[in-house]
Structures are given as C-alpha cells and as structure tokens.
Amino acid sequence: MIRYRAAWVVPIAAPPLRDGWVDVDRGRIVAVGHDRTQAVHQEDLGAVVLMPGLVNTHTHLELSYLRQQIPPSDAFVTWVRGVMAARRSLPDAQAVEVLDAVRTGIREAVQSGTALVGDISNTLVTHAPLVESPLSAVLFYELIRFNAPDAAGLVADACARIEALEKSVHIRASLAAHAPYSVAPSVFREIRAAMEPRTHLPWSVHLAESRDETEFIGSGGGEWRTFLEQVGSWDPAWTAPGVSPVQYLDDAGFLNRRSVVVHGVQMSREDLARLSARGATLVTCPRSNAFTGAGTPPIASFYASGVPVAVGTDSLASTPDLNVFAELAAMRSLAPAVPASQLLESATLQGARALGFDAEFGSIEAGKRARLLAVTIPATVSDVEEYLVSGIEPGQLSWVGESADASRVGDS
C-alpha cells in the first residue's frame, strides 16, 4: 500500500481536505484522510490538488478528423449540413485518417484529465482504439432513421452488432437514438424495449438542442421538415404531436433514470421538471452549443431544477479540444452563482453515475479505482474548488501512481 499526500484532496463526495492523503493498494482506494499520521510507503506530491479523473459524458470521437473542418454557424441546421458534407468527403469509416484522429482524440482526452467517456458512434469505429486505450467508456451505437418501416429489425440488428464487439472489462456498448427530428417514434420505443433487460447500461439521445427541433415537434414544419424532405428521409405518415421534444420522448417511454439526455438548450422549466421527475441525467456542452448555433444553455436553471447535470465536450467538429476543465470554465461563466462544488460533481460523479460506472469512478472513496489526477496549483489558492472550475490547462495535470503508467498508452 502507498499513501499519496497532497496540498489538497478533493474527494467530490466530501468537502476538500487541506494537507490530505489517499491510501492506495493494488489500484484501489483504501482510505482518505487529512491527519498527520505517517505511512510505511508514502509519496508527497507537493503543491497539487488530488482529485478523481474527469468524466466526459458526451463526445463523438469518430468525428475527430473533422477538427477545424466546419466553420461556426448561427443556424444549427446549417451546421449539420456542413457536417454531412464533410463526412461524405471521407465515406470510409475505417480510413487511416479517421482512425489516426480517433487515437489522437483519445490521447488528448487522457492528457486533459479524462478517465471515462460516453462516446457516440454511428460506425463503431472507435471501439478498437478505446479498448487499446487507458480510457473507460460507454460506447453508444447511435441510430438515425426517421422513416423506419421496420424499427424492430433495425434495433435488433444494432443489438447484434454491439453484442458482436470484442468483450472488454472497461468498455461497455449500448444504444443511442440521435434526436427526435431524426429518429422515428417506433425506434425510440424499440430501443427502450431492447435495453430494458440490460439493466447495467444507459441509453442516450440529443434532446431540445435547437429552436428548429422545438418547431418541428410542435408543428411539423420548419428547417428540419425541409431537411428531411431534401435527404429523402421524410415519413408522410408522421404527425407532429404538438408538444415539446421532452414531452414527446417522455410519452414514448424513453425517459427514465437510465436516460442520458444531451444539450437541453431549449428546455423550459416544465421540461426540466419533467426530466427531473424521471431521474434522467442532462449533459451540457456549452462550448459546442455556441459554435453550432444551437444557443446558450440555461445552466443555472438546470441546477435549480434538480436535474442531475453532467458535462460533455461534444466532438472536435464543434469544439477546439476535449478538455472537460475548459467546459467547466464555460459553465462557470454562464452560471456564476452555481457552487463550484456542484460543477465539479457534474464533471466527475454525476457523469460516472449517468454512465453506470459510479462504483469505479467519479469520486475518491474507499473501494473505487485509484484513477487519481494531480493538478498543480499556486500556493496562494484558498478556494480550491473555484480554482478548478476557472480553467485548467493540460500542462497543469499529471496522473498518479498506476494511473500514470496506464496513461502512457495515450502517448504512443
């Protein structure tokens, strides 16, 4: 057993400890404290904050090759059209450029302090690189089909594909539906039914991301109707329900404690109350929302509603990096009154809970994996939690102990 001492320990599940320590044995946390007792084997890390590795609850690693390829937009549908055009230019999901970019994205995520990700994939191309990496993950195989005459067959095929993946103790595979404007109601219901017996797995969806989505579900018109008709995906049998996107998915039975709901930029108070009542987790990605023209997420309202809030960077197609600390800084600027402790919990324990990995990640507690992150801080810092949500650069970070050894995989 080894004891790691630090100027601060931020357990997440408890208040910060000045002059704290964490005991680790064979990769597991044994105890946390802040007294002066000495251990037989001890390492003093000095002027650092010792905290759990971060959780990036929503990203798209397979889009990493689109970094700086798509300009920002003030209209979300316009931005999506840009993504589709860029993806058509490199149709082979297994292309060397795609795989190299995925591995680079994984390496950058590890170097910026991430231990666990929720990764959305339309192709499952990221599975092998994730298995080879030090990251743990839920890989969400995402379905997009608005006109789906055989929803049951579509979902059964998707389940067969994820079941056929190489088994890994640190990578789990599940399903995602893209969004209410791009997935048929029958597909939402079939995903829910297929995932019901897989009780250890969450499912995911982009929800209430843009005003165009609200208009489409409310009236059946607008930019998404035009888009679906242009790409040949419109279903003439579909009728707009005339409700909010959140109520639409709730009525389909898609929202519960296992739902990982992404964005929520356009959610009303009623929507947030409904989401809170269902126990779903809301993942916010404010930097991506600004880039894509989706809008500004009401971060303070998210927390006030009681909805569990997690953090995602989204993809490198819409953000400059995969640094969750940078996402926290964006959240802090949008919600200056939200306690820093809550923001940090969103980037750690709430994300781990949403992904079903909270027995292993998200906090420094006895029995959990010792995926420990050391953050160098100035000696003058007195409010360590506020410092951590104000913008941390990868150069301030290092992994500790066995985590450091494992993370060297990301440097290869």
Where are the regions a protein language model picked out?
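Histidine/acidic residue-rich metal-binding segments in metalloenzymes
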Residues: 1, 39, 126-133, 155-281, ...
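N-terminal metal-binding scaffold of metallo-dependent hydrolase/deaminase domains
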Residues: 1-38
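His/Asp/Glu-enriched, well-ordered alpha-helical/loop segment
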Residues: 226, 251-254, 295-379, 397
